[in-house]
Amino acid sequence: MFGVLNSDNHCAAVQQGNILAFGRTSSELWTNNPTSNYRCETGGNRTDSGQSHIRRPMNAFMVWSRDQRRKVALENPQMQNSEISKQLGYQWKMLTEAEKRPFFEEAQRIQAMHREKYPDYKYRPRRKAVPQNSDKLLPAAFSSMLCRQGHVDERWYPFTCRGGRTRAAHSGTEDRLNSSQAANIVRSLLQQEHHCSSTSLRHNPETLAIQLSTDFYPK
C-alpha cells in the first residue's frame, strides 16, 4: 500500500515538475525578445513607417472645432472628450451656411497646401490592431491535463483552457512557441501520465478489476 502511495506521489510530482518547466520555457521564449515585449506592453505593432505618418488635412468642421474644443474644455474641465465632441457636433449643425462659409474656405486653403506638399498622398484609414493568436493548438489530452493542475501559476503558463483546447497567447511569428519543442514536452507528459496510470493499476488489484470490468462490460 505504501508502495502505491509513493508511486502516485512520485508521478504527481513528475507531472507537476514537467508542467512548471514547460511554463518557464514558454515564459522565457515570451520575454527573450525585447521588441516583442515592447509591442506587448504598449498594445500595438509600431513600425518606423508609422512615425512618418502623414496626417489628413482638416475639413471645415475640424477648423471650426479646433478653437471651440479648447473653449468648451476650459469652461467645463470635468466634461469628458466624448461629451465635448457631441456638443461640438450639435453646435456645428446649428450654424447657418453663412457662418460656416469662412471655415469651408479655410479648409480648402489647407487642403490645397497639403496637395502641394504631398502630391502622392492618399487617405488610408488605419485599421484597428488585432492580436495574432498562435495557429498551433495543443492536443486536447494535454490541455485537459493542464486544466486539472490547479497549482500552475498563470504568470508562468500563458495558456487558457477552454473546451478541451489550449491556445497560446503569443503574438507575432517570431514569438510563437517552437512546435517541435512543444511536441516533445507534450509527448513526455503523456508518457508520464500513462506510466502513472499503469503503475497504479498494477499495484492495486481492486482498481485493476474495476477497470477491466468497465472495459468489457460498458454501461
Swiss-Prot record:
Keywords assigned: Activator, Calmodulin-binding, Cytoplasm, Differentiation, DNA-binding, Nucleus, Sexual differentiation, Transcription, Transcription regulation
DNA-binding region: 54-122
SMART domains per record: HMG
Family matches, as InterPro entries: HMG_box_dom, HMG_box_dom_sf, SRY, SRY-related_HMG-box_TF-like
Predominant location category: nucleus
Domain of life of the organism encoding this protein: Eukaryota
UniProt GO BP: cell differentiation; male sex determination; sex differentiation
GO cellular component, one term: nucleus
Pfam families in UniProt: HMG_box
GO MF, any single term: DNA-binding transcription activator activity, RNA polymerase II-specific
Localization in the cell: Nucleus speckle; Cytoplasm; Nucleus
Family per record: Belongs to the SRY family.
Subunit structure: Interacts with CALM, EP300, HDAC3, KPNB1, ZNF208 isoform KRAB-O, PARP1, SLC9A3R2 and WT1. The interaction with EP300 modulates its DNA-binding activity. The interaction with KPNB1 is sensitive to dissociation by Ran in the GTP-bound form. Interaction with PARP1 impaired its DNA-binding activity.
Function description: Transcriptional regulator that controls a genetic switch in male development. It is necessary and sufficient for initiating male sex determination by directing the development of supporting cell precursors (pre-Sertoli cells) as Sertoli rather than granulosa cells. Involved in different aspects of gene regulation including promoter activation or repression. Binds to the DNA consensus sequence 5'-[AT]AACAA[AT]-3'. SRY HMG box recognizes DNA by partial intercalation in the minor groove and promotes DNA bending. Also involved in pre-mRNA splicing.
Stated name of the protein: Sex-determining region Y protein
